[in-house]
Amino acid sequence: MSQSICSTGLRWLWLVVIVLIIDLGSKYLILQNFALGDTVPLFPSLNLHASAYYGAAFSFLADSGGWQRWFFAGIAIGISVLLAVMMYRSKATQKLNNIAYALIIGGALGNLFDRLWHGFVVDMIDFYVGDWHFATFNLADTAICVGAALIVLEGFLPSKAKKQ
């Protein structure tokens, strides 16, 4: 039985495009205006810091000789396809899940673009307290984390709210 894309979660794919535009635009601006390693303080505890990142979160596989680029690219493609299928199978009215999936897909594709185009992921947000610095990250990473948090939140909502 065929169903209209607008009646499925794929209706929310526009959010993937928004995430990609914002993420890739921010990375473009960083690469055009900063040398890798440059840091500019924005606020207390927040810097812009242009960096090339070869691994995954918290330096996972960062020094593995290059093969991890393709490994993480495959993961990004696989997760994006899986979530797109889940969006297709869900109703457009299941907003929270579909927004979460779209944020994760947008973030995954933003970092995938970096890995394929540059050979590394461009990170620029440096949050710190005193001398302790959190791992530098980008807007794609933020979209992925917000999407994951929404999925967790959805799990705690009563079933009536899940259908909204």
From Swiss-Prot:
The active site is at D123, D141. Its main location: membrane. Pfam families: Peptidase_A8. Keywords: Aspartyl protease, Cell inner membrane, Cell membrane, Hydrolase, Membrane, Protease, Transmembrane, Transmembrane helix. The chain crosses the membrane at residues 12-32, 42-62, 70-90, 102-122, 137-157. GO terms for molecular function: aspartic-type endopeptidase activity. It catalyses: Release of signal peptides from bacterial membrane prolipoproteins. Hydrolyzes -Xaa-Yaa-Zaa-|-(S,diacylglyceryl)Cys-, in which Xaa is hydrophobic (preferably Leu), and Yaa (Ala or Ser) and Zaa (Gly or Ala) have small, neutral side chains. One of its GO terms (cellular component) is plasma membrane. The keyword Cell membrane applies. Pathway: Protein modification; lipoprotein biosynthesis (signal peptide cleavage). It is found in: Cell inner membrane. It is an enzyme of class 3 (hydrolase). Disulfide bonds: none annotated. The keyword Transmembrane applies. InterPro entries: Peptidase_A8 (IPR001872). It is a multi-pass membrane protein. It comes from the Bacteria. Its EC number is 3.4.23.36. GO terms for biological process: proteolysis. This protein specifically catalyzes the removal of signal peptides from prolipoproteins. HAMAP family: LspA (MF_00161). Belongs to the peptidase A8 family. This is Lipoprotein signal peptidase. It comes from Shigella flexneri serotype 5b (strain 8401).
